[in-house]
Amino acid sequence: VKADPVISELPVADPISYDPHKTLNEASISGGAVIGVSGENITGTWSWADDSTVPVVDVTDYDVVFTPDDQKHYNSIRGTIQVNVLTANVNIADLPTASAITYGDSLAKSVLYGGTAYFDGINKVEIFGTFAWKDDSLKPFVSDSDKTLYTVVFTPADSVNYNTAEIEITVNVSKAAMPNLLLSVDNTHKTVGSIALPG
C-alpha cells in the first residue's frame, strides 16, 4: 500500500495580473517541501489541480497537487495556496464626445456619448463600462470652449478585475442669451387718502 506524504511547507505562486484569457498555467509555482514516512524530504513536482482555471481578483485560494517522483511508494497529495491577482489596466481606444452646453451650465448638463475601452492582454478585449465627468460641478467659461481639457473617468462594468481609467476631453460652450433689460412699469395710480391743508 502506498503511503501519503506530508506537506511541511506549501509552495508559493508568483502574483499575476488579471487577464480573461490567462489561466493558472501562466502563474509559476516555486518552493514547497514534502516529507515521507521516515521524515525524509521527498522530491517531486507541484502543479495546479486545474490549470485551466482563470484566476480572478476576488478569489485567492487555489488547489495545487504534489506528485512525488517515487510514485511506487507514495501517493500524490493536494494543498491550497494563495494567488495574488492584480487588477488590470484598461486603455481608452476612442474618446467619448461631450454634448455642448451654455455658459452658466455645469458639466453635469453635458452628456457624454460614444467612447470605447479595451484590455490589451493575451488577446485584445473590449471592456464595457461608463464614462462620467470626474467633477461635474465645474462651470466652464466661453473662453474654455473646445480648448480647456476636463477629466472624464471610465468605470468598467467589471470593477473587480479592471481599474478605472481617466482621460481628458474638451466641451463646446456657447454664449448665454442676454437677459431682457426692459422694465414693465405700471402707469396706473391709486388714491390712498386725503388730508386738509391749513388755510
Which residues does each PLM region occupy?
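Solvent-exposed, low-complexity, repeat-rich "mucin-like" stalks and linkers
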Residues: 2-39, 84-123, 175-199
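Short capping micro-motif at the N-terminus of alpha-helices
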Residues: 26, 77-79, 109, 165-167
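Serine/threonine-rich, repeat-prone extracellular segments and beta-strand-based repeat modules
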Residues: 35-76, 81-83, 120-161, 169
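Short acidic, gly/pro-rich beta-turn/loop elements at beta-sheet edges
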Residues: 74-76, 93, 162-164, 181
